[in-house]
From Swiss-Prot:
Residues 194-274 form the KH type-2 domain. It is found in: Cytoplasm; Cell inner membrane. Monomer. It comes from the Bacteria. The keyword rRNA-binding applies. NCBIfam families: era, PRK00089.1, small_GTP. InterPro entries: G_ERA_dom, GTP-bd, GTPase_Era-like, KH_dom-like_a/b, KH_dom_type_2, KH_sf_prok-type, P-loop_NTPase, Small_GTP-bd. Residues 57-60 are annotated as: G3. This is GTPase Era. It is a peripheral membrane protein. The gene is era. Keywords: Cell inner membrane, Cell membrane, Cytoplasm, GTP-binding, Membrane, Nucleotide-binding, Ribosome biogenesis, RNA-binding, rRNA-binding.
Amino acid sequence: MKSGFVSIVGRTNAGKSSILNSLLEEKIAMVSHKQNATRRKINAIIMHEKNQVIFIDTPGLHASSKAINQLMIDLAIKSIADCDVILFVASIYDDIIDYENFLKLNPKVPHIVLINKVDLADKKTLLSKLAQYNQFSSYFSAIIPYSIKQKFHKKILLDELVKYLPEHPYYFDPEFITTTNEKDIYRDFILEAIYENLSDEIPYTTEVRIDKIKELKTIYYINATIISSTNSHKGMILGKDGATIKRIGKEARVKIEKLAQKKVMLKLFVQLEKNWHKNEQNLKKILYDE
């Protein structure tokens, strides 16, 4: 019996959250084509044969001086020190310099390189990418081409990860799929709906706060506030006659209902907090409940 922690790291948009959801066969991590969508650590607990693999999905590694992005980078780096093995994820089309930058963090535990989205490339491109990474073969423990569309890739990956986990009793009940607070998952679903409905610049200065969750036998009542940094963005979130926020609410509700397996009544409000994303103390309170 083995049980241990795997940190999923890599640049933004490498597909880390999609991999986590596909391994779990359940959506708990926010997925977006926009960079740096993941803001909080999300974990997934996967039973593989008699072993328990606990994945930690972290914000993407990237260069940025913005306070919100720097806090997320710090969170990702901390997770590297708190795990048994690292899964470094790169898209087939990502530049290898991202891996070189990862190595500069001097990880102290074994790591596996996962080349994601290989279904988007031909064999020649894949072989070329593998050759680039093989220059660093003395650093990584394994390199695995991967596609979430190929079910057999899941077993290959889990078999490899388990090799580096310690012999240990289960950390969590085998029936659990995550220990991440439901509040964090739900607000990420709302944030994901915002990403899907608004232009590129708005989501990065927007945050979601869950104000109330009331669970009855057949229904969830959820009140949430969307925090905006400017009046103009607040207006765009609301939309003409409230059309945009209604659409955001509907899409978020469907996501939450699918995970919660019950009806959800979701009420969204919009609140102006100017430059909230530039205040580190405020960021820690909003993003990490500190």
